[in-house]
Amino acid sequence: MEQYKRDFIEFALSRNVLKFGEFTLKSGRKSPYFFNAGLFNTGADLARLGEFYAAAIQASAVDFDVVFGPAYKGIPIGTSVSVALFNRYGIDKPVCFNRKEVKDHGEGGNLIGSPLQGKILLVDDVITAGTAIRESMELISANKAELAAVLIALNRKERGKGELSAIQEVERDYQCQVLSIIDLDDLMQFIEQDPRYSSHLPEMRAYRAEFGV
C-alpha cells in the first residue's frame, strides 16, 4: 500500500471520520465500519484532505483541465484540492462548483468559478447511489465538456441492489474512470497489519464476502 493511503487512513481514524464497530447505513444494511467525510471540518483538516486528494491525482496521472466539486460536499473538497495541487506540486488548475438553486441575478446561472470546459475532474467524498454524478453529468454535457475522471475519498467496493456497485454503474454509464484515495481492500490490508484494529477483521471479512464486488 502506498504511504499516502496509509497516512490517510490514520488521519481519518484520528478525526473519527472512519470508525469501526456496528453501524446501520441509510440503505438499512449493517456495516462494520462507517466513513463520514463531513467531520473533516477545520482549516487544518481541509488542508490535509486536499493534500491526500492531490497525492491520489499525482499517483493516477489523470489528464484534466478543471477541478469540479458538486454541491454541497464537493465544494470545499474541490477548493482544497486545487490549493493543494498548487502548493504541493506547482499545478495551477481552475476550480468550478455548482449551486443547487439557479440564481437569476448578479452573475446568474448555476455555476461558480471557472467555466466548465475541457476535461473535467469531478471530486467528491463518496459515491453512494451515483445521484450527484448523474446530476453533474447533465451540467458537464450542457457545457460541452468531457468527464475525464471522478475522484472520491473512499471506494466501499460493495454492490447495491444489483450485482454492480454504484461506482461500477457510473464507470459503465459514463465510460469514465472512478479513482479513490483508498478503497475497501486498502482498509482490509491496514487492519490486517495493525493489531489495534485486528479484532474487527472477522466482521470486515464477512461483510466483504457478502456485499463486496
From Swiss-Prot:
It catalyses: orotidine 5'-phosphate + diphosphate = orotate + 5-phospho-alpha-D-ribose 1-diphosphate. Its EC number is 2.4.2.10. Keywords: Glycosyltransferase, Magnesium, Pyrimidine biosynthesis, Transferase. Pathway: Pyrimidine metabolism; UMP biosynthesis via de novo pathway; UMP from orotate: step 1/2. The keyword Magnesium applies. It is an enzyme of class 2 (transferase). 5-phospho-alpha-D-ribose 1-diphosphate binds at residues 26, 72-73, 99-100, 103, 105, 124-132. The keyword Magnesium applies. GO terms for cellular component: cytoplasm. GO terms for molecular function: magnesium ion binding; orotate phosphoribosyltransferase activity. GO terms for biological process: 'de novo' pyrimidine nucleobase biosynthetic process; 'de novo' UMP biosynthetic process; pyrimidine ribonucleoside biosynthetic process. Orotate binds at residues 34-35, 128, 156. Pfam families: Pribosyltran. Its cofactor is Mg(2+). Catalyzes the transfer of a ribosyl phosphate group from 5-phosphoribose 1-diphosphate to orotate, leading to the formation of orotidine monophosphate (OMP). Homodimer. Belongs to the purine/pyrimidine phosphoribosyltransferase family. PyrE subfamily. This is Orotate phosphoribosyltransferase. It comes from Haemophilus influenzae (strain PittGG). The lineage of its organism: Bacteria, Pseudomonadati, Pseudomonadota, Gammaproteobacteria, Pasteurellales.
